[in-house]
Amino acid sequence: MDKYNEAIELIKNSKYLVVFTGAGISVDSGIPPFTGKGGLWTQYDPKFIEISYFYNHPLESWKEIRKIFYDFMLDSCKPNLSHKTIGDWSKQGIVKEVITQNIDNLRQAGGAKTVLEFHGTTKTLTCTSCGKKYDASKISLDKIPPKCSCGGILKPDFVFYGEGINPEVLRKSEQAILKADVILIIGTSGQVMPACQL
């Protein structure tokens, strides 16, 4: 049996299939990966999403964050066939959980039910002063940095360089991996820490 058919059989016969996705899955949706040839960090300086830089230079950070993640990624990118297939399998009960390193929300838009966003999401913003959460689609980014009703600066809810992974998401991801009898890995080299330790 060739590897393709062997993979099909493993998926068909799995009792607890977990899908683990990285940046490569969203390339067909028009989102370049962060690293490698044509990656975002060949076009933009990653310092703009370093947590210390963000706190010290929120306006400069938000200019790039808005351009990269909100003007482009969220406005024009739609789920591709891979996202939709995972969504269909999730609805059919084939895929039990999805762990994603992506922050683009395309697995959910494709229909996946249980998605653990390992590196967070662009869909929500949190006040750096009071902790209040906002739906990013309801916040105008015409004036940046966006601010909370308390006057605090809003930060996207994705993990910046220098920040830790949300402990609850890490715990649930580890549990999902332990429950899995098959893990389907799509679009990741498996080298990003700490996701590669799962």
List each language-model region with its residue ranges.
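Conserved catalytic core of sirtuin-type NAD+-dependent deacylases
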Residues: 1-198
